[in-house]
């Protein structure tokens, strides 16, 4: 139905006909904090501490299924961030400066996790790294940049992640579109979801 299409030049008023409850109508007319039919007068941020000690790793698994199972295992671990990068996204940035040479030789099904953990002290970080490593011991790796505390190496690893969208967009075939929508899956369906998206 044409009125369901995303419209970036106007305001969709479908909520006036799609909903009967006044609260539903009003909440579907609100557009973030842009002031459309309302504004945000107060915001409460729940922040997380920026700990001085941190370590970052790039762990490459043989396939998306193993990678996703490892991501599930990390769910209960003291990690601050876990980003999944499939082979296509890794290929798009493999020629960037500072990346390991082995990235060119990864298998077609390779899938990586960029993992970061942070702690209030070096001793706490050591304990966290031991826990994280133990949780991943049963997942075979194809390659890795092991956990490093070196800020320069960490920045290079995060540059991989940050560079994937523009790089993927640059190498896509003419006439195709890059979709930058977030997708979510229940953690127990992550592997199947990622595999089906590929």
Residue ranges and their predicted role:
Residues 1-198:
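Noncatalytic alpha-helical scaffold of FAD-dependent oxidoreductases
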């Amino acid at each position: 139905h044409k009125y369901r299409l995303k419209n970036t030049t106007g305001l969709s008023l479908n909520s006036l006909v799609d909903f009967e409850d006044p609260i539903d109508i009003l909440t579907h007319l609100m557009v973030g904090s842009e002031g459309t039919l309302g504004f945000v007068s107060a915001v409460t941020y729940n922040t997380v501490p920026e700990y001085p000690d941190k370590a970052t790793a790039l762990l490459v698994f043989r396939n998306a299924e193993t990678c996703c199972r490892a991501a599930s295992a990390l769910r209960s671990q003291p990690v601050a961030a876990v980003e999944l990068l499939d082979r296509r996204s890794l290929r798009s940035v493999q020629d960037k400066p500072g990346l390991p040479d082995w990235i060119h030789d990864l298998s077609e099904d390779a899938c990586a996790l960029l993992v970061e953990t942070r702690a209030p002290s070096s001793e706490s970080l050591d304990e966290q790294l031991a826990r994280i490593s133990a949780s991943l011991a049963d997942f075979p790796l194809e390659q890795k940049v092991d956990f490093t505390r070196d800020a320069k190496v960490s920045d290079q690893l995060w540059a991989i992640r940050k560079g994937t969208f523009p790089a993927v967009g640059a190498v896509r075939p003419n006439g195709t579109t890059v979709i930058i929508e977030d997708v979510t899956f229940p953690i127990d369906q992550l592997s199947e979801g990622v595999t089906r998206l590929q």
